Amino acid sequence: MTDVNKTQIIDYDGHIIDNLKEWMNNNKLSKLGFNYNVIAILGSQSSGKSTLLNNLFKTSFDVMNTKLGHSQTTQGLWLSYDKFEDELTDASNEETDVEPQNKSNNKHVINPTLILDVEGNDSKERGENRLTFEHRSALFSLALADCVIVNLWYHSLGNFTASNYGLLKTVMEVHLELFHQNVNCPKTILLFTVRDWFEEFAPLDIIREKIVDEYVNKIWCELKKSENSKNANIDDYFIIEVVGLSHGIIKKDEFLKDIKRLRHKWIYELRPINYSRNIPADGFAQYCNNIWNTIIKQSQLDIPSQQEMLATFRCQEIKNNVLNHISNTIKEKMVDSKNKYIENFKTWAEKDIIEKSLNEYLTDAARYQKIICLKTLEELLENLFIQLQIIVDNNLNFTQRILSSKFSKELNSMYSICTTDKSYFLFINDQNVDVTEQDENLSNVENIGENSKKGNQIKCINLWSNFLYNADMLEYTTIANFFDQYKKCSVEIIEPSISNNEDKDSQEKRNHDFNYKNSLTILATSIYKDTNRIRSVQCNILIERIRSTIKEELKNVDNMLITVKCSKDCWDYILKIVNKLEDYIYTNLSKCFINLKTGINTTYLNNGDNIYARLNTNCDYGLGYFQNEQITDFSDDAGKNDDEMDTEIDQNKNDMESLFNSKKFEIITKQNKKEKYVSTINNDLNKEMNNKKLISELKKFYTEIIIDALKIKLDEISNNIANIIINRFESVFNYDEIDQPRQWRNISAIELKNIFRVSKDYAFLIIEILQKNIKIDKIDNYLSTNFINTDIIEKGKIKAKKRIQEICRDAQYIQETGGHMSLKNVPFAFWVILLILGWNEILMFTRLFFRLNIILPMLIGFIIIVISCLYTGNAQILSYINKIIFIVIKNLYNFYKHLQTIGHQTTKPEKVE
């Protein structure tokens, strides 16, 4: 049956067995920290080492059965432990001669001791190879043990081999080899147990003197020492203790008493308070592994390096265990963060994650080297921060999506009136618009004529003139709100302390700021895209309203074409309209275009650190990225789709410092926000209005818009050339010099012919006028001569001639006949016959109407509606009814007048002499 209280750690062949850590965990030894000790025993084979340990520490190492003969019993190295549980219940020490020097510190707790039973030396089984294993086991024991028991027989004192002189020399050489470089190395207790000692043979002091002088000091003098330890004394490295033990068989009772004294001496006098090798219990197994592997490889065994190696290994192991324990909590919160905003993240991260992880880590890791412990702790924190960063990113992504949507809605809402009101500008027929300059408010136009079209127009112009200012201030507010939310994600860390006695309030604190760049980049890019999108939409609306205004103004050209008599007058009139439109647009809308139009070559704005420059250049991180480029292309680039914007965004990658202008970013990120951000965009815009080059380019741009609208108008005129010719013809043919209708029955055929010829020439003169065969400044740069297509002219001529001939034939008919077409000429008999033949139909219609009871309900319903409206005072419905009655009566009257006109035209003409 296997004894669970002991385990083999090194087998006979010198291989380390890997179950030591499991054995220590099973026996609850791993949680001891430094509160344990290690004792090893060295001595000749079959010298009673295991028997001594079993009696001294209540262990169960295998012992030799002498009845079966002498043989090797302990093979390799074995480990057991003693928790001294019996001593905790034994309150009396009267039977001991030992004064418990360290008992006051361990009144209720006695640190357990790990006991290392080492294979005996001078073994015939190992033969010639024994020295190698003996040296290795001695080296291993000294690296681990607080105390090394050298077991020897009294009757062997004076012998070389039997007295373990060679073993002792090996021990001292190995110890010097291990600790000669370490000035503050722990002293190893060399406990000589003299077996089968009798007081009658020699006092213990004599034996002690003999061992110290003839063995220890002699060997120490013979050792080759390094420069560091050349002048060192044996007492600098060892504590020498000698005890005598009575014969275990002859004087068994005395032997047991000696054992008990030695046990108490170890517990209360010799035993260090903590493990002198400064290796925590949870790292002891790994430390043994490292030491033995280094010895086997015949490498230089450096204890500090081994301790550092162990500290690194154990701290990493503890760190990984902590991460494994806490990762599930973080992962659960991570899953939640994908679906919702994590409230109270700061408190949760500080208390439930960081503080809990640090406490769990330092509970075990604080026992190892401070530098390595703290270094690994920083790695632990870094790993936690990496995992928490994902939750922070999710939180900030929720924040940026909300802020991005809010930015877009607010900017859209601010310009909703401009989007809904698409009427043409009224300033064409009025004085110049006085645009209110915007100061710090996002919209300073609330008191301007809300219900009037003129008031809405001024409000729109004011908003457009301050678009960049509004966007800049709204951007500042949005980013400031983002950082307010971001600060809720920063965590405060109490600087870790290895000392358990340090008060938390006295410990230094530091903040960890998570990375916000990704979320801020997305937000800035979204702001950039939304601003450019809304800017593009508003620019298109502005241009469309200008075009509708130009179109409205060009309607006057239709009337001019009827009366114009020469090409110069026609084109001078058109040029006057163009100049008038250009002046009005420049005076009232230039600031709007500088705000809304991309690609305008400015001086102050493009070279400054402001939103305009960033919007007019290739932006990667939204409004903040600025390249000092100037764009002079005046093509219609007001609208760009998202794909085009994404292409621009992917073209440049820059640092976060170029996200926003430095002044704005500095104010936002300051802890003390006493300073207020003031946008300088409007000041720069006002400076730009004095830029002659900009004025020239703006006027050129306005001219292009006007000429484009003029071309469209001229195309309409070209397509309507036939009707224009006909209208010009009728204006001369049907009316005399004083604009009175001509009485064709009073005009002779020759006069009619002359009037027709003059009217026709006047009508077709418009073709030559529209061909622009003269030079007109400004218009010549955009419109060539003979711009009307020949085919259109020919088709218009054919259509116009046909209609002109019809008009002329009607006039000739009236001139020749002078007849009147009237209902009065219809015979009475016709109406009688119509009534007789249609009588059945009239009756059928009347019967159907009354059978369906339509007339009476309609009449009653109409009366009820009128009465209810009068009673309730609903003037709007009464107004509608009044309008309907008026329209019906008016149409009946017009129909009557039309019949009268036809009757007069068909009267019989008088004879012309």
From Swiss-Prot:
It is found in: Endoplasmic reticulum membrane. Keywords: Endoplasmic reticulum, GTP-binding, Hydrolase, Membrane, Nucleotide-binding, Transmembrane, Transmembrane helix. It is a multi-pass membrane protein. GO terms for molecular function: GTP binding; GTPase activity. It is an enzyme of class 3 (hydrolase). It holds the Pfam family RHD3_GTPase. The chain crosses the membrane at residues 826-846, 850-870. InterPro entries: G_GB1_RHD3_dom (IPR030386), P-loop_NTPase (IPR027417), RHD3/Sey1 (IPR008803). Residues 33-288 form the GB1/RHD3-type G domain. Probable GTP-binding protein involved in generating and maintaining the structure of the tubular endoplasmic reticulum network. It comes from Plasmodium berghei (strain Anka). One of its GO terms (cellular component) is endoplasmic reticulum membrane. The keyword Membrane applies. One of its GO terms (biological process) is endoplasmic reticulum membrane fusion. Residues 1-825, 871-913 are cytoplasmic. GTP binds at G43, S44, Q45, S46, S47, G48, K49, S50. Its EC number is 3.6.5.-. Residues 847-849 are lumenal. This is Protein SEY1 homolog. CDD domains: GBP (cd01851). Belongs to the TRAFAC class dynamin-like GTPase superfamily. GB1/RHD3 GTPase family. RHD3 subfamily.
